[in-house]
Amino acid sequence: MADTLQHNEWSGKTDGQPWMQRSLIAMFRVLPLWLLYGVMALVVPFYMIFNKKGYRAMYDFFHDRLGYDEWQSFLSVYANHFKFGQTILDRFGVYAGKKYQFFTEGQELMDELEKHPEGFVLLSSHVGNYEIAGYSLKPKRKKFNALVFAGETATVMENRKRVLSQNNMSVILVQEDLSHLFALNSALDNGEIVSMAADRIFGSQKSVECHFFDAKANFPLGAFAMAVQKNVPVLAVFVMKEGMKRYYAYVEEVMCDRHASKREQMEQLAQSFAKRLETVVRLYPTQWFNYYDFWKQ
């Protein structure tokens, strides 16, 4: 059963022991952000050397999917790892009380859905820094439920729950017995917001094939199936880093033909999401954080 809940190529777990993470939070309270970024810039080359699988996957992404030459691909891999490190540092910065600027495009879409009694689904992906959206896209009327990986350290989970709870948000952990599905369905039945990632296949999870960067890629069916079965609206949210303390959030509708068969609706939602994801990744290519061959899932 555990195999169904862990990606075969990429665990998605934040690196570092709990004491290291607690120390990082403490350092954020006394050190400027630019200094920690500088240390990260020096660490990145070593991480690239020892994380060969992740390096290769990102190099192939820039070279094969975006058409970069060899030198440009290499530099982009470094920029990608550095940007990923920055987003992790920013997350711990929030835990330590650091403030960031957020600009949101499409906030009115969320505001409008919150006026209606039914719940809705927010789809995220492993680009930019979606978790930090939980500290900016604050629901005004509805409770927000985020489905998250259960394998993080206690330090990460405690701080995540603490910060989110301040904004009428709660965490639903992925469970081996799949009980999280009941929690998600219950939240939608109660007219609440459900948020989950829609870009990674875990083990034997059912998937849907989509056209993505001029090739076929598999996306998990679960989020789209839930939205269709519950007949609720779907939004995609991408939160991209644009400066040292500045993020830009894109909130977009994910549409399908509600008169089509349920299977066709799921496929249309998945393709609509994949199209929007590709658009954002092309705008921010160094913020694509799936460190495995996405097209060979």
Which residues does each predicted region cover?
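Non-catalytic C-terminal accessory region of glycerolipid acyltransferases
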Residues: 2, 50, 114-115, 139, ...
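Membrane-anchoring hydrophobic helices of lipid-metabolizing enzymes
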Residues: 2-124, 157, 161, 168
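Hydrophobic alpha-helical transmembrane segments
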Residues: 21, 67, 135-138, 217
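Catalytic core of membrane glycerolipid acyltransferases/transacylases, capturing the structured
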Residues: 71-72, 76-79, 118-176, 190, ...
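Short, flexible loop segments at the rims of nucleotide/cofactor-binding pockets, characterized by
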Residues: 96-102, 170-175, 213-214, 259
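A conditional alpha-helix N-cap/helix-loop micro-motif detector
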Residues: 102-103, 127, 153, 174-177, ...
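Conserved beta-strand termini and adjacent loop/short-helix elements that scaffold enzyme active sites
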Residues: 105, 147-149, 174, 252-254, ...
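Short amphipathic alpha-helical segments and helix-helix/interface helices
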Residues: 110-111, 134, 160-161, 184-185, ...
